[in-house]
Amino acid sequence: MFKILEKLTAKNKKQDDIRMPSHLSAAEQKQVQTVIDRARGDRTIPHSAQESIPFQRMFPDGICRVTDNYYTKTIQFQDINYQLAQQEDQTAIFEEWCSFLNFFDSSIRFELSFMNMATDASNFEKMVRIPYQKDHFNPVRTEYSTMLRRQLAQGNNGLTKTKYLTFGIEAESMKQAKPRLIHIEIDLMNNFKRLGVRAKLLNGKERLHLMHDMFHMGDHDRFNFDWKWLPESGLSVKDFIAPTGFAFPKNRIFQMGGMYGSMSYLQITASDLSDQLLKDFLDMESSQIVTMHIQSVDQNKAIKSIKHTITELDRSKIEEQKKAVRSGYDMDIIPSDLATYGKDAKALLKELQSQNERMFLLTFLVMNTGETEQELETNVFQASSIAQKYNCNLRRLDFQQEQGLMSCLPLAQNLIEIQRSMTTSSTAIFVPFTTQELFQTGKEALYYGLNALSNNLIMVDRKKLKNPNGLILGTPGSGKSFSAKREIANAFLVTDDDVIVCDPEAEYTALVKKFEGQVIKISPSSTQYINPMDINANYSEEDNPIALKADFILSLCELIVGGKEGLQPVEKTVIDRCVHQIYQTHFENPVPENMPVLQDLYEALLRQDEKEAHHVATALEIYVTGSLNLFNHRTNVDINNRLVCYDIKELGKQLKKIGMLVVQDQVWGRVTANRNAGKATRYYMDEFHLLLKEEQTAAYSVEIWKRFRKWGGIPTGITQNVKDLLSSREVTNIFENSDFIYMLNQAAGDRQILADQLNISPHQLSYVTHSGEGEGLLFYGNVILPFVDRFPTDLELYRIMTTKLTEVQEAKEA
């Protein structure tokens, strides 16, 4: 029928009377006549661009009166990771989306709008530019901002992609429409929540802003509007959103402001549709709008209509059989199309009656744009190629460009009478979800690479997570240490946070020195000391910091004295008693020179009567007066610098475990002091698996993972030995309390264990299988994204951060 309609419309546009083909029903003839009347457009030509916009009034609460008795609302919804999800998760999303569609009855019209709109590149550049601060590092900030702009240019962040659902109902008045619209809105928000999709209702100003941006795609005109301006100016809301003009000079293109556009509809001819079709349309890197108008058909009417169709087909079948008998043919031989249609109609009837399917009428529209006619035609050709790839056709809306354009507005007002009947499952195949983006615009959002699926910048703020604790995992050469250094540098330049690094391989010295940080070299030959007995009044959230410090000293003594069985109960008792005694003296006059050292504990133990106290004192002796007395000194370095690195590379096997535990306690002291000052503390632990090897350091690490969040601490474990990490008894606690994981290339044995631990799909796992340097998966809360970080190698920061031996040597020689 629609082919006939197109021919009639084109051929007879200037004729007043059209003879309808006799085989069309009265309803079909009326439908054709309506479209032709619209196509003529010579009886109701709008006098202005404002008049062309087909709504009557926008209310501040977001309700729009489109016609005398038709009211609509718009919801903006975010994306979820459908394309990257496991097969069972994709099935679950699809089934939930089917239920979502089935919510709409025939009294609710709705429209899905997918808008890809170019935005001013300078706006994005402003978002990624790092503001200057009053320190010596603004040249580095400039360099880092330049790097971000270069990365931005590689992606298509200049294209803003948004998704909307607009729904509308018929009502006699605003008073009657409002409560029902609110009720539908609440149900829809709950349905989105079940899908795991974040959604928000647009108010009137936001809806106007959206239409303004759509009408001003090519000129980047700013939206300036306030409700209070209307009475004073005598203007209508349309004056604030309309372009300079609309022009429809040809039958298949239009001009809107300074931009060319073309409206097309998707002719669905494929027997089977793919869930990739909509995704491919939305992946086009040009300004465009994809719109789906969907109208649910009353179930009884749909069933009745199909039954009528079956009856008509049966009648035709009988006629064909009679014809066959008269002609002397076998009456069972009937046209194959007739048999196929009959079979399909019966299958459809069964679906509607017993398989929770509904019938929908779908109009699928695509608006392509271009700065020139040539660019427009190129974009239309690309969209047509996508349709043909899936055995469908993209047809231009000849003589209906204006109606098509206005049907793309988020008003749920369909002015195009080209509809395709589809069941729930067929309609749901246009799954409106592809891949989630992680581009946060807060001032503390940090750079983590480009989204491997969309090539857009990944910028996130770990502080926005419920649990900002993190892990950086990767095989040697995958970019693990570089990623940690990049985050450290970024955090130092962007935030006011303090940064502490536990560095077992002396890899971070150059970076720390670049930012005038403090490198504390802890080794038997060093003259830099940190005191494991350091304490401050904020050490515990309770009123008694000594009790928590005693717990740490017990862990320390466990490493020194414990052996396989650990400390005995009596030994724990005497240690606890002595700790309270020596700190009681300190808190009576808390000056630095009164801070206890290990020798004070050693002497206090010797003063006790129990033989167990003397046993512990004897074990401590080598760390107090012997050759391992490194930790029997008061702290003599600046541990309050914004950036502190504890270099423990030269600690021998005997001291390394103790050194790591002491560093952890120093960090805890810093975190507690910073919390009191309202400051966050980032703590990076390289070779993190070593901390989980020993029971005491593992238990302390788990405590850090559990308690840091409340105190403004953001710990990050970095390791290449994933097997050792995963073999720890504490690993479950670590993973359960980590909402941020930066996973680079993984060894074959580790991949499957991680997949089981983190519920990673085989497709997701492919991004950490034989992946290149700086490539992998980012876990941010519930979002999993593949990333690629091609950090420019010509920057000074790169030379400081690289761990490649040849590049490190070149940097030293330079």
Kindly give the residue locations of the regions a language model identified.
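P-loop NTPase motor domains
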Residues: 80, 87-106, 113, 117, ...
